Curated annotation (Swiss-Prot):
It is found in: Periplasm. InterPro entries: High_potential_FeS_prot (IPR000170), HIPIP_sf (IPR036369). GO terms for molecular function: 4 iron, 4 sulfur cluster binding; electron transfer activity; metal ion binding. GO terms for biological process: aerobic electron transport chain. It comes from the Bacteria. This is High-potential iron-sulfur protein. [4Fe-4S] cluster binds at C43, C46, C61, C75. It holds the Pfam family HIPIP. Specific class of high-redox-potential 4Fe-4S ferredoxins. Functions in anaerobic electron transport in most purple and in some other photosynthetic bacteria and in at least one genus (Paracoccus) of halophilic, denitrifying bacteria. GO terms for cellular component: periplasmic space. Keywords: 4Fe-4S, Electron transport, Iron, Iron-sulfur, Metal-binding, Periplasm, Transport.
Length: 83
């Protein structure tokens, strides 16, 4: 179930960052970022994901204040989380 405070893919910031809830539907192959192969890039291993906000498959993201992103998502700002 999608939480009411989840980022929608039509959100202006989401559009600008090419965010998709399902990384497999994103442009991550064409716009892959350094750190991991494109197929391994998703919100769950991104430095912008906020692990203490949200629950289940949904977490906070510093790029979308006050909203939740899907851990299986991807956006063009993906950056490998340290550690």
């Amino acid at each position: 179930e999608v939480p009411a405070d989840a980022v929608t893919e039509s959100d202006p910031t989401a559009v600008a960052l090419k965010y998709h809830r399902n990384a497999a539907e994103s442009e991550r192959v064409a716009a892959a970022r350094p750190g991991l192969p494109p197929e391994e890039q998703h919100c769950e291993n991104c430095q912008f994901m906020l692990p203490d906000q949200g629950a289940d498959e949904w977490r906070g993201c510093s790029l979308f204040p006050g909203k939740l992103i899907n851990l299986n998502g991807w956006c063009a700002s993906w950056t490998l989380r340290a550690g």
